[in-house]
Regions:
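Small-molecule kinase domains that catalyze NTP-dependent phosphoryl transfer to phosphate-bearing small molecules
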Residues: 92-146, 155
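Loop/turn-to-beta-strand initiation segments
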Residues: 48-52, 75
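Conserved catalytic network of the ASCE P-loop NTPase/AAA+ motor domain
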Residues: 43-47, 68-72, 123-125
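Short, hinge-like loop/turn segments at secondary-structure boundaries
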Residues: 26-30, 70-72, 93-98
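Conserved nucleotide-binding/hydrolysis micro-motifs of P-loop NTPases
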Residues: 15-17, 58-60, 80-86, 138-139
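Short catalytic-loop micro-motif centered on adjacent basic/acidic residues
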Residues: 52-55, 132-134
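Conserved phosphate-donor/acceptor-positioning beta-strand/loop module used by diverse small-molecule
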Residues: 70-90, 133
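Conserved substrate/cofactor phosphate-moiety recognition/catalytic segment
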Residues: 1-47
Length: 156
């Protein structure tokens, strides 16, 4: 977006969760609080002219539906990826670049965690996202370009 002159604030669910719940349990109640806070912050920012990108799994449709209801200029970008590719990518995360928890799939498969979306916790696929990006088939640049085209199509 910066390359085309559009500034945006990224709201990361993982970063916000660390502030709200320093020792997260990933319960349904905790997720309700975190996703509710994300939408609330996005709503405040957009009312003040700030473009917002919400970076979140939002494993329940109700979280995405609430964002769509409360944010007037909203598009849902579904970044689709097969589970085996997610597992491979997560295993290669290094450094502090990623704010997401580590070894989530390993913990899910060993029974240490029962809250990983799509494994121990439900993941409800979007029904009508404005754009679908198959991140296992496209490069990161191609994914970004497809999302940018959807943004332009809806707002410019």
């Amino acid at each position: 977006l910066k390359e085309v002159g559009v500034d945006a604030q990224i709201l990361s669910s993982d970063m916000l969760r660390k502030v709200i719940t320093p020792k997260p349990k990933y319960t349904e109640d905790e997720r309700d609080i975190v996703y509710g806070a994300l939408v609330f912050i996005a709503e405040l920012l957009t009312k003040n002219g700030v473009n917002v990108i919400i970076d979140a799994t939002a494993n329940r449709r109700r979280y995405r539906d609430e964002a769509r209801r409360r944010l007037p200029k909203f598009i849902e970008a579904y970044i689709r990826c097969p589970l085996e590719i997610c597992i491979e990518r997560e295993s290669k995360r290094i450094g502090e670049t990623y704010h997401a928890p580590r070894n989530i799939y390993k913990k899910a498969f060993t029974g240490e965690s029962k809250t990983v979306p799509g494994i121990g916790s439900p993941y409800e696929e979007p029904l009508n996202p404005e754009v679908i990006v198959d991140s296992d088939k496209l490069s990161p640049d191609e994914c970004a370009e497809k999302i940018l085209k959807a943004i332009k199509r809806h707002f410019y």
